[in-house]
Amino acid sequence: MTHKHRITAFLLASLLFLSVISTGCAEQTDLPPADESATDSESESVSDTEVTSAPDTSAPEKDEPAVPADDFHSELQYNKIHDPKYENVEKYAKGKRELSRPDGILLDFSADGLPEAASYTVQYSDNASFTDAVTVEGLTEQNYRVLNLKLGQKLFWRAGTDAANAEDGTVHELTVAEQGPRNLFIDGVSNVRDIGGYASSLVEGGKIRQGLYYRVAKPDDITEAGMAEILRLGIRREIDLRDADQCNGPYVDGVAYTAVSIPSGTEPTRFEAFDAEYRQIFALIANADAAPVYLHCTAGADRTGICTFMLLTVCGAEYDDIARDYLFTNFSTQGSRVSNYTSEFKQWWKKLDAFEGDTKADKAKSWLVSKGVPAEQVETIREFVVEGYTAS
């Protein structure tokens, strides 16, 4: 190669080297900015101190559970309940699958030091003396999931290899989370919940009592276990709102049955009409001797919905709580209620403004009185349903 050729080759190689460096620098400059949502450990580089420090021999932190141990809702329910945009319920459930049942509270006694055994026994109660405790025997695992607890209740529990041994077991205590709804599991029935536990504006610090009024879907397929749970809850009366030819109760022996038919397809007139039916329904609700009651139509959503709406409203529940309860039907198999929420629920709330009263609760009272429900009976309902309320 001549001297001239060597110079030319050197210049070409130099240009190629500079081109590569330039390209690399351009690629580095064009990197997207760091993700602002990343955690500190993701967005910050590791320091020299961190690299050279002694290894951490402590146990790694466990991930926080998706649902707190004191909350009986499923993860999907929990996320929906704590989503401030509660009207966006179809993000979680669309009324096509059975998702309305609670997960319950897990009682895990695997760390209690019990010996290995063929079976285990757990006892739980709402008091530290274990008065009227529930005893569950024959458990093959060292845990048990308890269902249908009340919001905010105390729960005491202990375990052993048998009932006698359990009485000497370690006593655990927790307080159930207070955020509603109080949805329940009744085998063979969908869309079951107690309307209690919500705040009431009728009295400072007031709440809707739990265990008085349950809303459910049709109980036609209720099982023996479901019937037993109805009786365990102390329910005394069933109110069936379906079409007359569908009212085939009673469904549970020992529970009084009353059919108060509000025909299907009457959605546009349910606020203005059916005076006699509403009088009968609210007379039953006012009768403390008939409580607790469970009320249903077919889906436990629309006819059941307006009765529950009026009961919660007249008892001082807030709009957001009443709306959340109404939309929870989406977690059942009874179809989405998002369109009904707009066409019915919101209209009920708006139409109440035409009635006398300074508050929505008093406007709802005026609506009931316009149906022929005596004002004294409305006050009886309030005293019965709202903790701490006394009629003036």
Question: What does each of the following model-derived ranges do?
Answer:
Residues 2-11:
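Bacterial N-terminal signal peptides that target proteins for export
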Residues 12-20:
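Bacterial N-terminal signal peptides
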Residues 19, 45, 50, 133-135:
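Detector for intrinsically disordered, low-structure N-terminal pre-sequences
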Residues 20-37:
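Sec-dependent signal peptide cleavage junction
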Residues 27, 31, 54, 59-293, ...:
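Cys-dependent protein tyrosine phosphatase-like superfamily
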Residues 33-60:
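Intrinsically disordered, low-complexity serine/threonine-rich repeat tracts
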Residues 296:
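Residues at the beta-strand->loop junction immediately N-terminal to the Walker
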Residues 299, 303-304:
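Ser/Thr-glycine-rich phosphate-binding loops at phosphate-binding pockets of nucleotides
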